[in-house]
């Protein structure tokens, strides 16, 4: 799992934006349905743009159809890795078997 802390968050310079990747493409319709079912906080889903945005434990998460994931308000790569494991468990049914 490739994780990079790319740049400081605008609202809190002590936290970063983590750029990650599932390693698989995302079926956006399934993803949006899954996130609605679990009542993801502040969910915004766009099938047309191929992106879902929601809040998870005080972090802003963006999942793209390509499999890219941006997590805002992260302190360390270990924290980002833990969030990614949580995300994979939440949305595994929306991940396609074909790699991106």
Task: Set out the residue ranges of the language-model regions.
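Short, Lys/Arg-enriched, disordered terminal segments
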Residues: 1, 99-100
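A broad, low-specificity signal marking well-ordered, structured residues that form hydrophobic/aromatic
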Residues: 18, 52, 69
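A short, structured beta-strand/loop element
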Residues: 42, 46-60, 66
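Aromatic-residue detector
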Residues: 9, 39, 44, 53, ...
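Flexible, glycine/charged-enriched surface loops at secondary-structure junctions
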Residues: 45, 97-99
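Short, compact, well-ordered microdomains
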Residues: 59-95
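Short Lys/Arg-enriched alpha/beta "domain-start" segment
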Residues: 1-45
């Amino acid at each position: 799992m490739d994780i990079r802390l790319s740049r400081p968050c605008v609202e809190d310079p002590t936290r970063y934006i983590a750029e990650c990747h599932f390693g698989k493409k995302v079926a956006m319709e399934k993803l949006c349905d899954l996130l609605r079912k679990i009542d993801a906080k502040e969910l915004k889903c766009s099938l047309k743009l191929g992106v879902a945005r929601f809040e998870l434990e005080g972090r802003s998460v963006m999942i793209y159809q390509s499999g890219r994931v941006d997590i805002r308000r992260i302190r360390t790569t270990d924290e980002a890795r833990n969030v990614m494991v949580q995300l994979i468990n939440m949305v595994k049914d929306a991940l396609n078997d074909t790699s991106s």
